[in-house]
Amino acid sequence: MSTEGGPPPPPPRPPPAPLRRACSPAPGALQAALMSPPPAATLESTSSSSSSSSASCASSSSNSVSASAGACKSAASSGGAGAGSGGTKKATSGLRRPEKPPYSYIALIVMAIQSSPSKRLTLSEIYQFLQARFPFFRGAYQGWKNSVRHNLSLNECFIKLPKGLGRPGKGHYWTIDPASEFMFEEGSFRRRPRGFRRKCQALKPMYHRVVSGLGFGASLLPQGFDFQAPPSAPLGCHGQGGYGGLDMMPAGYDTGAGAPGHAHPHHLHHHHVPHMSPNPGSTYMASCPVPAGPAGVGAAAGGGGGGGDYGPDSSSSPVPSSPAMASAIECHSPYTSPAAHWSSPGASPYLKQPPALTPSSNPAASAGLHPSMSSYSLEQSYLHQNAREDLSVGLPRYQHHSTPVCDRKDFVLNFNGISSFHPSASGSYYHHHHQSVCQDIKPCVM
């Protein structure tokens, strides 16, 4: 057979062995190596390495211990320093600064200057006085010196004196203004409001003038004092000679015939018109005394002669009872009787008519008062401020010489028919009714 004579078939190859890592030992070898004791050289090397590692560990631990000890020491030292600083702060906080004196710097400077016999000090001498007197200025705080300089230079109370030629040193003397010394009289160093000295200086002349001229029953104001009251106040009158000013007397009071400056006391009488007010019991106005003759002059609104009091007749308009009229008629004729008064609204609204006077004989006085009159106006152009004229009464037999009376202040009253007091060239007041006409009193219908 051909099959038996041919070459035999090759034998089958064995399967390839599984791949193994060269680095990883066999499991048996590893176990055997672990179970078998290591050789001596290996033990020596491992022991040396372990000892070196332990030595390194010991050195590192020692280093850490030393570092921790150093940190603890530094912390302790810092804590001790902090405690020491806290103790010093507490110790210094217990020493409080002395309290400031209860005076202003102006008062302190005035104290220093007044303590000097010459009443003047330099800036350094003021410093020395304050430091010697008050413990507050002896401390570490030095800002008070700036305050002293500020008050010296900016306050009106202190004057910087010029430096003397032969005086050594560089500082100027400071003294107190003589006009401000009254602010610190009797050791009073209290604080004053701003502008106190200027107000006091402005009020000083007026105060002395009023104090020297005030009085009751005598001259109220000095000769040169120019008194002009506002519309709501009674009008003042100038005076000269024996009068000198206003007379503040109740109505009906007779100042007496023996006033100084009267040549013929038996010819002069002084009466006063009561206040025009709705109630008869109201107060009276101040008035100006005017000398009189026997017959009398109707120089005021509705003023009658011979002691008779009269006003508008019953046919005229009612008399207003406004209190503003009270301040208008003040410098008046003395011939109006003290018993004359303005009627109240409840009573008859008209004034009494004199029996001897008729509306035809005295048309100016019989005209009614304007009911809407509320105030008066003082015409400055008619005021005789410089010329002191004597009132010559009417006819020659009534004239008297050198009688000091009120200045002729001219009142423009808001009346319809009542005469307004305007001056004329004659300068004389004539009897208002009967045989003569009044040349100085002209009707002024407003």
Curated annotation (Swiss-Prot):
Q: Name one Pfam family in it.
A: Forkhead
Q: Which domain of life is it from?
A: Eukaryota
Q: Where is the composition biased (Basic residues)?
A: 263-274
Give a Gene Ontology cellular component term annotated to this protein.
nuclear body
| Coiled-coil stretches noted in the UniProt entry, renumbered to this chain | none
What is an annotated GO biological process for this record, any one? embryonic digestive tract development
Q: Where is the composition biased (Low complexity)?
A: 45-78, 311-325
Q: In which tissues is it expressed?
A: Uniquely expressed in the bronchiolar epithelium and in type II pneumocytes.
SMART domains hit by this protein: FH
Cite the record's Pro residues compositional bias ranges: 1-18
Chief location category: nucleus
Tell me the domain comment.
Two activation domains, AD1 and AD2, C-terminal of (and distinct from) the forkhead domains are necessary for transcriptional activation.
This protein's assembly is summarised as:
Interacts with the transcription factors TBP and TFIIB.
Protein name (Swiss-Prot/TrEMBL): Forkhead box protein F2
Q: Which organism is it from?
A: Mus musculus (Mouse)
